[in-house]
């Protein structure tokens, strides 16, 4: 009787993990159909849209001035875009440097800071109407033709665009792994989705929205997972999210294990909260055949990849010792997951140097598993990631 219960539990756990593995494998295979992405046609005569560019900056004294200066080098008409920095808990010296630049410096005072509140404050303070709003992180660096390329893409009629966010640093094992993880996400949740007509996932920065839509929805944000909330709004309304694979946004990757854990804890909290909030609208999505919404709901229930690999390895070893025949299905899932993730990694990153970081990945995965108990189901607390 005891072994019967163990066997049933084993099968239930395996079935649950299979959902995550099957999802990853499917989109990894889809991504193989096009490694170059979908190219847009450069139309120089395209009329210039107007952009409001927002830089929420919470204690970002080390990076914000440099990021804004780099952005102002755009080869785009200066009267067609405006930069606003939401300066929260920053030094006076930083704000003075920003004030010397042709940008608007907003200085909100929040009892409890969050990126959502910063975006809400910015929209409430801006009086001019724009065509689009761009959201960047304080450490983000873009190329000089960023707005030009974005403008051309938007002329195809998109209301929401997620640009290709990629690593700008690889100064530690943690930052290398963080950068690889970012590219796997780009492959599975953005490029592959667009290839079969589904919406891309948002990522928190490098995002562009129709200004009217954004200004009417930003006030509805209530959690620290503002990008997931915006994504749900878009999917419920049937608005397609385009992934701009060739419009790059260079993002500083975390370099320390502590920052990595804080970041992942924030993401896990956002994922759990998003999944719970999406469930109540799932029946409506089925009735309306809203495939994007159903897909996103399934995506929110996936086990984080590093924890998935750790759990599959653990179960494979345990079942090999306890019941070898039962372990075959676990080893199969582990191998399939490994192959799928390998396919999702861009070829340029499949190097001996990257794969030598497996030990670091294992240590980070164990720490992540320990942090599960700290998940904030309401996801109201803002967890800041320092830039060293």
Where on the chain are the PLM-derived regions?
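Membrane-embedded multi-pass helical conduit in multi-pass membrane proteins
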Residues: 29-33, 37-45, 299-379
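Cell-envelope/extracellular polymer assembly enzymes that use nucleotide-activated donors
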Residues: 49-52, 82, 229
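Short, acidic, metal-binding catalytic loop of nucleotide-sugar glycosyltransferases
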Residues: 69-80
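Long helical/loop segments within the catalytic core of UDP-sugar-dependent glycosyltransferases
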Residues: 107-118, 122, 144, 149-223, ...
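Active-site nucleotide-sugar/metal-binding loop of Leloir-type enzymes
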Residues: 120-132
């Amino acid at each position: 009787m005891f072994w019967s219960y163990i066997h049933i539990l084993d099968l239930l756990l395996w079935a649950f993990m299979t959902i995550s593995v099957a999802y990853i494998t499917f989109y990894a295979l889809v991504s193989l159909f096009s490694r170059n992405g979908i190219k847009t046609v450069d139309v120089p005569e395209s009329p210039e849209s107007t952009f409001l560019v927002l830089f929420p900056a919470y204690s970002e004294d080390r990076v914000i001035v440099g990021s804004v200066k780099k952005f102002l080098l755009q080869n785009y008409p200066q009267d067609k875009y405006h930069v606003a920095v939401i300066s929260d808990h920053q030094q006076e010296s930083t704000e003075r440097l920003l004030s010397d630049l042709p940008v608007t410096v907003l200085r909100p005072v929040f009892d409890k800071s969050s990126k959502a509140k910063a975006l809400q404050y910015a929209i409430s303070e801006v009086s001019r109407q724009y065509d689009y709003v761009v959201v960047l992180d304080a450490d983000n660096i873009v190329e000089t033709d960023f707005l030009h390329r974005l403008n051309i893409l938007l002329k195809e009629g998109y209301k929401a665009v997620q640009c290709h966010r990629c690593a700008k640093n690889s100064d530690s094992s943690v930052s290398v792994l963080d950068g690889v993880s970012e590219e796997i996400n780009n492959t599975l949740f953005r490029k592959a989705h667009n290839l079969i007509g589904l919406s891309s996932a948002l990522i928190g920065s490098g995002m562009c929205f129709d200004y009217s839509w954004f200004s009417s929805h930003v006030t509805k944000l209530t959690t620290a997972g503002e990008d997931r909330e915006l994504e749900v709004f878009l999917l419920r309304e049937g608005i397609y999210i385009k992934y701009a694979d060739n419009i790059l946004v260079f993002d500083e990757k975390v370099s320390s294990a502590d920052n990595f854990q804080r970041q992942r804890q924030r993401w896990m909290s956002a994922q759990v909260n998003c999944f719970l909030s999406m469930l109540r609208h799932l029946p409506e999505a089925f009735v309306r055949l809203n495939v994007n919404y159903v897909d996103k709901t399934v995506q929110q229930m996936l086990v984080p990849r590093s924890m998935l690999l750790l759990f599959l390895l653990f179960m494979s070893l345990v079942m090999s010792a306890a019941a070898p025949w039962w372990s075959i299905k676990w080893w199969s899932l582990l191998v399939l997951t490994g192959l799928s993730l390998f396919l999702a990694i861009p070829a340029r990153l499949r190097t001996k140097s990257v794969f030598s970081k497996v030990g670091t990945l294992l240590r980070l995965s164990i720490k992540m598993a320990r942090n599960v108990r700290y998940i904030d189901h309401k996801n109201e607390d803002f967890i800041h990631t320092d830039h060293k």
